[in-house]
Regions:
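Acidic side chains
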Residues: 1-3, 18, 22, 99, ...
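Short, surface-exposed helix-loop/turn micro-motifs enriched in polar/charged residues
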Residues: 1-2, 30, 201
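Short, small-residue-biased leader/transition segments that mark boundaries at the very start
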Residues: 2-10
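Internal glycine-rich alpha/beta core junctions
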Residues: 9-153
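Glycine-rich cofactor/substrate-binding loops
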Residues: 109, 124-259
Length: 259
């Protein structure tokens, strides 16, 4: 984490909880589109005595688009709802990928990946490039633009069917495979991640524990502003001492990550 206080790498499992929320939006999108539009014909229903309930059951839809006009008007909306659910997953993966790229670089060095999952530099033999995560990030950022593309393509269309709607397929359908590939690539990378041990033993991280020392004084009854000032003065005077451990926790924090 980039804030200046200690945490644990398990805190970076937040994408798991984010993906759990993303699944809620995917289920919601599925519920929106799991309705039978057949029988709406050119947009105003059929003059034949068809049984739309029967076709709904035979095709496995959960329900009907009852209003035949809405069955046509829902085109564009259905694609946009699905695209947004895909974009939510893509957003989670792109952020995860950015963090992985950041934590891999030499200024952090928090994580490591096997050589076969990284690429070398064109001129620097010591460097390992996180190309897989960079490609995931780029693909997912493109998917995040998809809801806006669909919104713009369907703006100001009057009720009914229009040939404009045909173009939605070539934007939406490839996104399913792209996102699936990104999920699989992320899974492969994370299954091979290596976390650096004893990161906080590095001298440059000693001031991360300044907050913990302030908290100790506060818990001992010293007002926060006074504790804050004391630790700050100790740091300026070169007298700051600390223990490289954290004594507190709560639900969802260090050592207590459950959901």
């Amino acid at each position: 984490d980039l804030h200046s206080f200690p945490t644990r790498r398990s805190s970076d499992l937040e994408p798991a909880e984010s993906l759990a929320d993303d699944m809620v939006t995917i289920k919601a999108a599925y519920d929106v589109v799991n309705k039978n539009p057949l029988g709406s014909a050119a947009g105003y229903g059929s003059s034949f005595p068809i049984n739309r309930t029967m076709t709904t059951k035979l095709l496995g839809f959960a329900d009907l688009n009852y209003n035949v006009v809405y069955a046509q008007m829902g085109r564009g909306k259905a694609e946009r709802v699905v695209a947004q659910s895909l974009a939510n997953v893509a957003d989670t993966l792109s952020k995860l990928s950015m963090d992985a790229c950041l934590y891999l670089n030499q200024n952090f060095g928090f994580v490591h990946f096997p050589a076969e999952l990284t690429t070398g530099s064109s001129i620097m033999p010591h460097k390992k490039n996180p190309d897989v995560f960079e490609l995931i990030r780029s693909h997912c950022n493109r998917i995040k633009a998809l809801p806006n593309e669909i919104t713009l393509m369907t703006t100001n269309l009057p009720s009914g069917y229009h040939r404009d709607l045909q173009l939605l397929k070539e934007h939406l359908f490839p996104a399913f495979k792209t996102l699936k590939d990104c999920i699989e690539m992320a899974g492969l990378m994370l299954s091979n991640i290596e976390i650096k041990k004893d990161i906080l033993s590095d001298e440059k991280y000693k001031y991360l524990f300044s907050v913990e020392e302030v908290n100790k004084l506060v818990n001992a009854g010293i007002p926060f502003r006074d504790a804050y000032k004391k630790i700050g003065l100790d740091i300026e005077a070169g007298k700051f001492t600390y223990q490289a451990s954290v004594a507190h926790t709560h639900e969802g924090s260090i050592g207590n990550l459950r959901f």
